[in-house]
């Protein structure tokens, strides 16, 4: 993808932004193709326990034996988001996404956001997340690649910042050196449409300008 885009638009810098599920895929992409990029922004990420991810992957494989890989399991879906709304119960099941209730309601009303993944999709996702626990895989990431981690300190995906810090530490342990991180007080998961989204955009812009100078 990067090679093709560079053919169409040569001579310009390339930065990758990965948010939420995309942040996990972005981290994998950086290990394989980070040498093609000038930097990356990792937003709303986390670092789930390896044993839990392995269990979820095994469960998907077992369920597929009986239902097929295209089966959409509510159980696996609920397990994947278990506990995210803890402490916010009462209004919707997804208030963990955002302090802006209107944005949460827009999300819930959009069928492109609320469909259930197939077992195959979950299996692939869990397989990818497991790669991020492999030090040899992480060591493939360019050591000096500029990285910016952004998250809300009330985002359950990143365990209120603790999972974000574990993700960063895993990269530092692999020798990746050029990492910055900012946690936004009170912010939840969807930073680009959170109540402080203007601050987030300004921080992204400032970071990009610094690395384009």
Language model features with spans:
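Active-site nucleophile elbow and catalytic-triad environment of alpha/beta-hydrolase enzymes
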Residues: 118-139
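Short beta-strand/loop motif that positions the catalytic acidic residue
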Residues: 149-151
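Conserved alpha/beta-hydrolase "acid-adjacent" motif
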Residues: 156-166
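Short, proline-enriched alpha-helix->beta-strand connector loops that line the catalytic pocket
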Residues: 141-147, 177
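Alpha/beta-hydrolase-fold enzymes
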Residues: 26-112
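Conserved acidic catalytic loop of the alpha/beta-hydrolase fold
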Residues: 1-12
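Gly/Ala-rich beta-loop-alpha elbow adjacent to hydrolase catalytic centers
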Residues: 17-22, 26
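Catalytic active-site module of serine/aspartate enzymes centered on a nucleophile-bearing elbow/loop
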Residues: 174, 178-213
């Amino acid at each position: 993808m990067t090679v093709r885009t560079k053919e169409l638009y040569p001579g310009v810098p390339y930065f990758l932004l990965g948010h939420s599920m995309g942040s996990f895929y972005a981290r994998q992409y950086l290990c394989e193709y980070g040498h093609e990029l000038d930097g990356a922004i990792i937003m709303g990420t986390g670092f789930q326990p390896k044993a839990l991810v392995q269990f979820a992957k095994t469960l998907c494989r077992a369920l597929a034996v009986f239902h097929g890989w295209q089966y959409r399991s509510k159980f696996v879906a609920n397990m994947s988001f278990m506990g995210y709304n803890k402490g916010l119960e009462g209004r919707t099941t997804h208030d963990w996404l955002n302090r802006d209730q209107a944005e949460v309601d827009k999300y819930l009303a959009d069928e492109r956001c609320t469909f259930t993944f197939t077992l195959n999709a979950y299996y692939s996702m869990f397989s990818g997340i497991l790669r991020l626990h492999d030090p040899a895989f992480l060591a493939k990431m360019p050591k000096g690649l500029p990285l910016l981690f952004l998250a809300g300190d009330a985002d359950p995906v990143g365990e209120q910042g603790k999972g974000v810090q574990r993700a960063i530490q895993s990269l530092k342990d692999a020798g990746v050196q050029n990492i910055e991180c900012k946690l936004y007080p009170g912010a939840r998961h969807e930073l680009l449409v959170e109540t402080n989204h203007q601050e987030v955009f300004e921080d992204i812009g400032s970071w990009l300008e610094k690395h384009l100078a």
